[in-house]
Curated annotation (Swiss-Prot):
<keyword id="KW-0055">Arginine biosynthesis</keyword>
<dbReference type="InterPro" id="IPR037528">
    <property type="entry name" value="ArgB"/>
</dbReference>
<keyword id="KW-0418">Kinase</keyword>
<keyword id="KW-0808">Transferase</keyword>
<protein>
    <recommendedName>
        <fullName>Acetylglutamate kinase</fullName>
        <ecNumber>2.7.2.8</ecNumber>
    </recommendedName>
</protein>
<keyword id="KW-0547">Nucleotide-binding</keyword>
<dbReference type="InterPro" id="IPR041727">
    <property type="entry name" value="NAGK-C"/>
</dbReference>
<keyword id="KW-0963">Cytoplasm</keyword>
<feature type="binding site">
    <location>
        <position position="86"/>
    </location>
    <ligand>
        <name>substrate</name>
    </ligand>
</feature>
<feature type="binding site">
    <location>
        <begin position="64"/>
        <end position="65"/>
    </location>
    <ligand>
        <name>substrate</name>
    </ligand>
</feature>
<feature type="binding site">
    <location>
        <position position="197"/>
    </location>
    <ligand>
        <name>substrate</name>
    </ligand>
</feature>
<dbReference type="GO" id="GO:0042450">
    <property type="term" value="P:arginine biosynthetic process via ornithine"/>
</dbReference>
<dbReference type="InterPro" id="IPR004662">
    <property type="entry name" value="AcgluKinase_fam"/>
</dbReference>
<dbReference type="InterPro" id="IPR036393">
    <property type="entry name" value="AceGlu_kinase-like_sf"/>
</dbReference>
<keyword id="KW-0067">ATP-binding</keyword>
<feature type="site" description="Transition state stabilizer">
    <location>
        <position position="29"/>
    </location>
</feature>
<dbReference type="GO" id="GO:0003991">
    <property type="term" value="F:acetylglutamate kinase activity"/>
</dbReference>
């Protein structure tokens, strides 16, 4: 009987959060271990369906770097990286589009739909669809400088690696009105029709800003942001994060991720969250419990 009461208390704990977030939009960046393990993939899909059923509008932006690497290897092509960014020539870009926009995207869509009961449906798109993501070639020198990585200029032509220039949210708004869950591959295009592979964290931030989302959530392979003593922070402000970058507490691959959080907040998103995607149902645990399971970031 005691365990039954505990379950009821857990459900009741979620009630005020459900009430507050009903009708709101959450943009979720899906990647890392959460995509690689079957049990975590299932838990993610269940979380997304749960959000939709209780009246929250989830929008998913996914990565797929490891999958791209696997297919390049199968085709006898070498993966080259500069500071964590994949050098993407025209041939590589074609494979990126095939893997991200096709194989990875549709597998996520299929999994979510398998849990939907037919009442709501996921639909897979890229930034090319509906002119969703207008992009431009990444200013690599500026990008690396922003994360404290000063590289020789001659090493900075990354090919078809892009950055978001503009988001046209009209398609996403229509999909939401028709009860669809958008699943977005981070590929954009420019005025000349060139395709670009874009960091999915920054795509999620830009889309969240364009939709004026309530939250943007990043599934990662860490517990959350850590302080100088290695303790996980349950919350942090932008000023604290900037100081942690300055002090070298936040470094390496975490810098672009927190900068994506900051971009989203500056574009009007209420809160950003860095979650441990290795934890099953991390989305529900972060959103619908008082304690949460990650780091909540605010202005």
């Amino acid at each position: 009987m005691e365990s039954i009461i505990e379950k009821a208390e857990i459900l009741l704990e979620a009630l005020p959060f459900i009430r507050n977030f009903r009708g709101k939009t959450f943009v979720i960046k899906y990647g890392g271990n959460a995509m690689d393990k079957a049990d975590l993939r299932d838990a993610f899909a269940q979380d997304i369906i749960m959000l939709k059923y209780i009246g929250i509008n989830p929008v998913i932006v996914h990565g797929g770097g490891p999958q791209i690497g696997q297919y390049l290897k199968k085709m006898g092509l070498e993966s080259k990286f500069v500071g964590g960014l994949r050098v993407t020539d025209k041939e590589t870009m074609d494979i990126v589009e095939m893997v991200l926009g096709g194989l990875v995207n549709k597998s996520i869509v299929q999994l979510i739909n398998s849990y939907s009961g037919g009442h709501v449906k996921a639909v897979g798109i890229t930034g090319k669809d509906g002119c969703l993501i207008k992009a431009k070639k990444l200013d690599a020198e500026e990008y690396f400088r922003s994360i404290g990585d000063y590289r020789p200029t001659e090493l900075l032509d990354l090919g078809h690696v892009g950055e978001v220039e503009e988001v046209n949210p009209e398609l996403l708004i229509h999909l939401d009105e028709d009860n669809y869950i958008p699943v977005i591959a981070p590929i954009g295009f420019d005025a000349e029709g060139n395709a670009y592979n874009i960091n999915a964290d920054f795509v999620a931030a830009a889309i969240a800003g364009a939709l004026k989302a309530e939250k943007v959530l990043f599934l990662t392979d860490i517990e959350g942001l850590k302080d100088e003593n290695g303790n996980t922070l349950s919350s942090a402000t932008v000023s604290q994060i900037n100081q942690m970058i300055k002090d070298g507490v936040i470094k390496g691959g975490m810098i672009p991720k927190v900068k994506a959080c900051i971009q989203a907040l500056e574009k009007g998103v209420n809160k950003a969250h860095i979650l441990d995607g290795r934890l099953p149902h991390c989305i529900l645990l972060e959103i619908f419990t008082k304690k949460g399971v990650g780091t909540e970031i605010t202005l």
